[in-house]
């Protein structure tokens, strides 16, 4: 987020796989709560996910500790005024201008759609007993 404007860097396959997982769960015969214990829908998409992950930092960029080809780095030009910048991982389904708000939205998501198959779709759910469905990082600073 730069100056309140949201910039996303999604993995090219992730939304499609999240949609596929949501469809498997919605059309499945298992009780929905079962997927919080044993997410068999995720297990079905894992092979495709692993295959596409082989292209990380080859055909698209991710921050994973390895070299990122320059052509996949998004450059956001700023002028010489103060700018507030927020960098966050995809563990926040709804990025807000404060960490507290982002955490509140995460809590709302966990309480209202722990499978992540509604408005926000993900390739994994909030596993039973977990406060999150993914790792989280959030930093806000001004330049």
Language-model region placement:
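Surface-exposed beta-loop interaction hotspot
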Residues: 1-51
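C-terminal catalytic subdomain
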Residues: 38-143
């Amino acid at each position: 987020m730069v100056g309140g404007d949201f910039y996303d860097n999604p993995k090219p396959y992730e939304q499609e796989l999240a949609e596929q997982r949501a469809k498997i769960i919605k059309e499945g015969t298992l009780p929905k709560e079962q997927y919080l214990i044993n997410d068999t829908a995720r297990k079905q998409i894992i092979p495709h996910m692993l295959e596409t992950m082989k292209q990380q930092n080859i055909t698209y960029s991710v921050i994973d500790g390895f070299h990122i080809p320059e052509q996949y780095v998004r450059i956001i030009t700023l002028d010489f005024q103060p700018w507030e910048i927020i960098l966050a991982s995809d563990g926040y389904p709804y990025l807000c201008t404060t960490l507290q708000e982002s955490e509140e939205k995460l809590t709302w998501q966990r309480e209202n759609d722990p499978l992540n198959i509604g408005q926000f779709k993900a390739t994994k759910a909030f596993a039973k007993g977990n406060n999150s469905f993914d790792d989280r990082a959030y930093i806000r600073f001004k330049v």
